[in-house]
């Protein structure tokens, strides 16, 4: 489910580019608090169907405590989850494109491809 303008924009860019992708992609064993699966916003596949790169859109709550998202406690959990996701990608040699909320207006095919190393 697309929750934010940033996620909707990323979806549109990937879809319009004709890139094969899935939303809310998870890996077995990658879990957060209370063993809840940690999902990546988007997984983009290459021509062979293998993972090319993952895309995460990080809203403001990824960078500072926001009361409506649960304040400091939720922020601390969010940071732990973000670290786990980054570590997973590093350990499994998977490219991770992280798009911060303050770059929301810059989201484009070129922006995503540059961030993915193309």
Report the location of each language-model feature:
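Nucleic-acid endo/exonuclease domains
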Residues: 1-118
